[in-house]
């Protein structure tokens, strides 16, 4: 690696962060400022300068996707190699959970101890802990509160008082949750099992309690890098502190304006206290935004009013942000549909996304777009599965694949990721001899995957959109009760809602459209305070005009297009009806991809339908589906 080449394409602020002294450093990196680039270039530059030993580097982030992206970038910079089976001289890059699990594995191997089993089905374990008092569908709410308590290092005995102080308002009484929490911890102890956050607690305790283990761990890891540090919770921070001991070689990157996970235990105060913890660290900023036009960034800054933001757009001036007021949620859907249809006409490069505060808002929009034949990028299976397969491709040896699959099955609560892990295990069993690596496994996985819709309108919650960017973003539900959400009660929660709106706005690179409905569910609404007294960068419109162009006369759709839309709508109605009867999600009955194939092929026999759905599903749903396909061809 040539150190000068690493700095060649960085701006002055980025270069200052990459080349600062190897002591405690905190970088405030705004949206679109190139923070991951700075972090990876910092690691590469330190190694190139000889001030960091790659085998002693520990880089921690919050998702396996982010860790995989960091590895990819470091490999492109020449730091990691894809053709090396021996990774002992490579940086360690992972999530808090994966690093904790790796340390516990090493500890168990060194002491010939048994590594505790990780709970596979937490809901079932909670039900068993409560016996006749099990909570049924409310178990999810209880487990969410237990996760919050773990993240904040709150014991069952202190839960009720701490949750009350934090003004937590779960669907179940706090005293009931405290009882359930106590029972859950007791049954875990009785059965010798742990859950994910226990891994971090156990690793932290092992370092703090065992001098020999602490010395070995701190000998191994000497240079610390943390991404997205604004999302740290107290438990994760205690783990980081145990890992580093009294070392000052720590490089922290975060954006306080993107701290949006307080509901699950993250505490922005952790990031705010870092200067005091590290003792006179170097504090730097990355103020340049290379993503958003000046107009988009001006509105995002307005949304974050009350917060002093040192950010500036490095983009050329763009089009005004558009604020559209409509009568109700049905007109809101119509505005989104018209915008999406325009986008279909020009293609999906650049990208287009609809963002909402809650998933519930997105469901009718998705149905409307699908019924009108507008492609919708699969929100369920494709993203997590694709990311997991990309991670598999990074594995260099059979051992790497085995460890990756075990980690996912231990760590992940996502069904698609766990399916990929099980498929990797099946692949390894079927390839018991010969050389096996991640690339061959990834080829196998992709070949066995039905291709989901990859191009189309993306529908995401504000939380789900974090870390993403799109050319055109439409934000729906710009009303009080959604922005900010009605569940926000404390000043801290309201501040987080403001940051969440800021995150949503800064997903847009070129075009931002904000839609407000005057009525929702038959009730009058109040405009979101975030979009009151809008700056000059905003153009107000009514529902009669779409944001990018006014309606114009076009030729009527071809009869075949109309027939396809009608069949798609009726198949969706069939799917929804069966799903309601079976108390399940519509996609569990028929996937969007299967409906698209039925619309395209128009099967008229059970045998033809079976080639799409398989014989079992075809036999179960055949009568209802074939009735619709017959009607569409008559």
What are these regions (language model features)?
Residues 83-103, 121, 372-395:
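Conserved beta-strand -> loop -> alpha-helix junction used to position metal-binding or nucleic-acid-contacting
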Residues 1-112, 215, 298-301, 506:
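P-loop NTPase Walker
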Residues 223, 368, 385-541:
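Conserved helicase C-terminal RecA-like lobe
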Residues 8-19, 23-28, 38, 58-59, ...:
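Conserved helicase NTPase motor core
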Residues 27, 31-39, 43, 54, ...:
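Helicase P-loop NTPase motor core
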Residues 521-634:
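Accessory DNA-binding and partner-docking regions appended to nucleic-acid-acting proteins
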Residues 21, 88-90, 109-197, 221, ...:
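ATP-hydrolysis module of ASCE/P-loop NTPase motor domains
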